[in-house]
């Protein structure tokens, strides 16, 4: 899972590493439980956590640590799940700090917001968690559970992210092929999750979303029967959780986001703001979504009905500030900047080439239809290797004048070598645009084409 600092494009670990060998090495390097004065092997998630944040933050802690040690993804996810589950079944009161009332900047009628908040010490909680992880690893040395050894589809995912000319990098991304193992889901539907979050006003909201959206999705009872609804609820709940954190810690950041959940033979996408995902099928772009922007007629009407306004400065902005109309966070712009995501689904037939998820730093300057040619030319030059294609796409965005943070993720649904051998069926075809599959008619068209955002 790649929700920490941005990383260069990389393939998914093959999982071919010997699981018992990994456990042996791990326990050789960490032969004893941690003492209170010992340093943590991986950075703790902040200073305090609310109880609703514990599962996601500890899972992220484990996946970051195990990923740094090249653990096979199914093993890393299963280990993380078992250790988190065991710790959550214990009494966490020993980690409790004195409860305090959330400080309200303005009067709020929501009783939940006014209730005392139980906060836990993140450092001591992380130490206890690592000791639990060592214990589970020791137990599994004798007998590794089937879930940790189960074969799964090997995904080729190319990821590249750059700060560009901005002072700070505020994007985050997630690549989680072992979704089921991380959350202990035992139904027969294989799931993989991918996401890009584009932060603004700081990285806190983007990092938070990269940790908690998929955790909240996995905990929705309707995930097996209504994945779209589960993803929408996951965004909504993550927004509520972050707003509580933002009020406690006086954070002002926000983030747009887009995610793709591949569940068996169905693709589910959800989005908030202007980060986007497209599908390429047999060389043709399939538009899956319409980004949320202030100039969209329905978004403008929603904002004005709430008492806000949309104005054009260097670009269209909500209340003269934000260039997005929906986002997680942005505590001082709620409810005008909505935390309600949209979602859509599509059956996969096996003829799909790849998914591309990216932030507006890419899509504001690279039209959808140019993506196919850029990917195909890269595959041609690299003799069918798609490993570094995201770097090529990021470079193309920079050449076209993007100054924003740029994150691009390409999830191949077929072997790139097959795409090279099959050629780019849409390139140079005057009827390609007519054959392009467009977004569902239930989604509104934008009022105007949005200019690049600075």
UniProtKB/Swiss-Prot annotation:
Instruction: Please list the residues that bind Mn(2+) 1.
Output: 198-199
SUPFAM superfamilies hit by this protein: PP2C-like
Region spans: Disordered: 1-28, 419-454
| Cellular compartments per GO CC | cytosol; nucleus; perinuclear region of cytoplasm; protein-containing complex
* Record-stated family: Belongs to the PP2C family.
Disease entry from the Swiss-Prot or TrEMBL record = Defects in PPM1F may be a cause of sclerosing cholangitis, short stature, hypothyroidism, and abnormal tongue pigmentation.
Provide the protein name: Protein phosphatase 1F
Q: Which species is this record about?
A: Homo sapiens (Human)
